[in-house]
Structures are given as C-alpha cells and as structure tokens.
Amino acid sequence: METKRNQQRNQDGRTDGVRDGDSAAKRMEEGRLYFPGDEDILKEQMECMELLYDYNATRPRESARRTGLLKQMFGSIGRDCYIEPPLHSNWGGRHVYMGDFVYANFNLTLVDDGEIYIGSHCMIGPNVTIATAGHPVEPGLRRKGIQFNMPVHIGENVWIGAGAVVVPGVTIGDNSVIGAGSVVTRDIPANVVAVGNPCRVLREIGERDRMYYYKDRKIDM
C-alpha cells in the first residue's frame, strides 16, 4: 500500500530535500514536487481512509448511509450519485468533485492525490482507474519517493468502459465514450468514441448512433 510504503520512508529519514521552506502539503496543493510521506499529509490522509473503510463495510441495503458517507468523503458530490463498493481511493475522495446522477460500478480506483472532476450523468464501468499522481523519471528523485499531481477533468455524460485507465492531466470532453480497456494518455474531445492503448479517437458520435444502439439493433424508445 502506497501510504504504508511512504510511512516507512519517513521512518527511514528519507526526505525530499526541499530548500524553499514550503511545507509538503503546500507543494502538494500547488502541483509541485513533494514528499507524500510527510507526517502531516499522512495524518490527514489516514482520517480520509477511515471513512473509506466505513463506506466499503456498508451492507447492501444501507444505501442511505453510503450516500451520507460520500458527502463526508468527497470534495463535493451532486444528487443521486451511486458508487458500487468496493471503492478504492488514496484520499477517500477528498479531492474528487462529482456532479449529479453519476454511476460508477465496483472497483473504481481514484488516485485522488490531485483533483478529479467528474461531470453530471457520467457512467463508469467496473475496474476503472482514474489517476492524478505521477513520479519523476529521474531515478534519484524516485528513489526518495518524490511525487507530483496533475488534475483530471471528465466532462458531462461521459461513458468510461470497464477496465479503462485515465492518467494524470487528461481531459475528456462531454458525451464521449471511452472503450473498455483503453489507456487514456492524452485529451479526448467531446462527442467521440475513443478506444485503445494509447486511446485514440475512433469516430465522432453521429446519425447512425441516433438510430442504432448496438450493431443493427434499432432504437425503439
């Protein structure tokens, strides 16, 4: 677990060597390089993880309790959102900002060290990962566990298929569909179907999509 590994690094006396006097928390908030094993960061993070544990321990019929917990956990969350447990998150959703009517299937992983914005009416398949955290390529900094975060923006009415991965700094436009298993490494425009590793635009959403919902099956409602 990342938090436990950072705790060990902290105990070993490995620090980021920052000389400007800014706290790790301030550097984290500003998207700069920082040491995630900082004691103050870990203390705040642990409080978030306790709420996440409570969420994942709810019984199937405790939907009202889950809704209440999400309001405590997330940076903000709109109405009628549903996230199937288990939910995995570095900060328990503290840096997640979600609109209305969002559905996420089980095993959603939110690496929310940085901000994640998810628009209204989004659907997220099982085993999707949305990550904001990265590490420098430079070996010396990585050896010290140094990290940086880049926000992810997902527009409204986006469908992300099962097993997709969205990496730090990516924006996905409104109404787009991300195919199952895709790895989204760059921005995806609005109103397109995009698939693959790396994820690329396959086509625009068009007239045929308004006539057929699957292959030759016509929309009848």
What are the residue ranges of the model-derived segments?
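Short alpha-helix at the nucleotide-sugar/activated-sugar donor binding site of glycosyltransferases
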Residues: M123, S176-V177
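Short-chain dehydrogenase/reductase
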Residues: W159, V177, V193-V195
